[in-house]
Amino acid sequence: MAASMCDVFSFCVGVAGRARVSVEVRFVSSAKGKGLFATQLIRKGETIFVERPLVAAQFLWNALYRYRACDHCLRALEKAEENAQRLTGKPGQVLPHPELCTVRKDLHQNCPHCQVMYCSAECRLAATEQYHQVLCPGPSQDDPLHPLNKLQEAWRSIHYPPETASIMLMARMVATVKQAKDKDRWIRLFSQFCNKTANEEEEIVHKLLGDKFKGQLELLRRLFTEALYEEAVSQWFTPDGFRSLFALVGTNGQGIGTSSLSQWVHACDTLELKPQDREQLDAFIDQLYKDIEAATGEFLNCEGSGLFVLQSCCNHSCVPNAETSFPENNFLLHVTALEDIKPGEEICISYLDCCQRERSRHSRHKILRENYLFVCSCPKCLAEADEPNVTSEEEEEEEEEEEGEPEDAELGDEMTDV
């Protein structure tokens, strides 16, 4: 049951009409599936579309470690200065230009029943209307025996940082269908994401859960069923259906990163200052990030993932002509042209980060094959086809380090810094 073209564009915001006239979804091949193509000239730097996800959820360990985000849109809730104080471990850390912080605490609201926090009344209402009535634990928020808490604890015991997925993304899918008046529409939307064979699904689940994935998957399925069973999507609760749902989230979940501190830094970059003042501010920010790295390491953002209908139609290229980002400090995904895109040209993003894209063809293929189960045939890979299938010594060392990390360390789309 495929989603209609109308459904594909229905989660675009702001420039939704623009997206409908500037791009179209086409079938490419049995290997690639769908693709997104320009129908008119798109200029470099132009926003091609802005899209909100069908569902999104913060990663569970990220939330447990006090990365405070709106429970609906993932907007960072800490003031930039509070964020800096927590990440540096310095309660007295003060930021200059506090007026540049965009966080509005006066607008924050919590659920009156379970106390989860939202950035605004609009987000609280949107969550309540879409899925939160089903998922709200009420006064049992901290009860370890509540079915949802048992499910989340089981997930945390299996999927450690760096996180790439969340069982709560799947929970919000079910809860959305449960609450929906038009259940068939939501089932159509979720079913349009790419499907894998049984063997491919097992590879994805293995990547997420590790060597004991079969037993762990069955434990999660049992807890998931106990907490959320819904007759309208009963197939999602069977062993095969749950594995498919898991694989759907593992391959289609787009990483989301938000940070009030990053927003403040970007605002500082736009200030018109005297050269000496600019030098002082830049030096302050450089030192701030050094202090954060020493205290916190690489985990700077509120992190989660979401399912985006139109963005999921964008195929990968190692030389992308578009990129994804989250400049609004929430779950609204912007796809922006990196170069002029001609009518009829496919719009491609990269599933690899900047460093990975600079590695050898062999290394790029290894990452893509392990995480997305395809072999890239973009212009860069075709041009390098005659290169030997070897990695440099530096890349081999990096791969050895990665093999020492949790097996899920690289799964998922690039989390774009804000």
Curated annotation (Swiss-Prot):
Region of interest (Disordered), residue spans: 385-418
The protein's Enzyme Commission number: 2.1.1.-, 2.1.1.372, 2.1.1.359
Zinc finger regions, MYND-type: 98-136
Enzyme class: transferase
Positions contributing to S-adenosyl-L-methionine binding: Y351
GO MF entry, a single one: histone H3K36 trimethyltransferase activity
Localization: Cytoplasm
InterPro entries: SET_dom, SET_dom_sf, SMYD5_SET
Catalytic activities: L-lysyl-[protein] + 3 S-adenosyl-L-methionine = N(6),N(6),N(6)-trimethyl-L-lysyl-[protein] + 3 S-adenosyl-L-homocysteine + 3 H(+); L-lysyl(20)-[histone H4] + 3 S-adenosyl-L-methionine = N(6),N(6),N(6)-trimethyl-L-lysyl(20)-[histone H4] + 3 S-adenosyl-L-homocysteine + 3 H(+); L-lysyl(36)-[histone H3] + 3 S-adenosyl-L-methionine = N(6),N(6),N(6)-trimethyl-L-lysyl(36)-[histone H3] + 3 S-adenosyl-L-homocysteine + 3 H(+)
Family as reported in the entry's similarity comment: Belongs to the class V-like SAM-binding methyltransferase superfamily.
Further comment: Acts as a strong promoter of malignant progression of gastric adenocarcinoma and hepatocellular carcinoma via its ability to mediate trimethylation of 'Lys-22' of the RPL40/eL40 subunit of the 60S ribosome and increase protein synthesis. SMYD5 inhibition significantly decreases cancer progression, and renders cancer cells hypersensitive to inhibitors of PI3K and mTOR.
Subunit structure: Interacts with the N-CoR complex. Interacts with EHMT2 and CBX5.
Name this polypeptide is given: Protein-lysine N-trimethyltransferase SMYD5
